[in-house]
């Protein structure tokens, strides 16, 4: 992902309330390995169910606020993240919902999908043994991940 500044992040959110923006925690941007990320995703340390996802769409940073469901999937079964398509224990995948942008979202309309609980999909697609993930495979998985994140974000931005 192209590096993001705090100003990029704060101005990017399409479905955040003024209160959410005022309380928005910014992750340690100086620690980011931008070349190893397709999007920036993080959880709010003060609001355990809240998370944030920022990606670039057509040279514009677009951010969405997501909320995890209160419960989790049943332990002992496998689940798959709809972003990175990585199968993993069900306890590591969570249903997240996001309010639609604009009046539609203010009226309570949301969209949900299953995502890695820590929003660390960019790292997960890179954590297989090297012989199973040559650079070309990682690039292909990264492009597919970014496309799915952008599609979900575009759905959030639809107001009808």
Which residues fall in each region the model found?
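Short, flexible, mixed-charge glycine/proline-rich loop motifs
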Residues: 66-77, 106-110
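Short linker/helix segments within small regulatory modules
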Residues: 97-113
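Polybasic, low-complexity binding patches
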Residues: 126-159
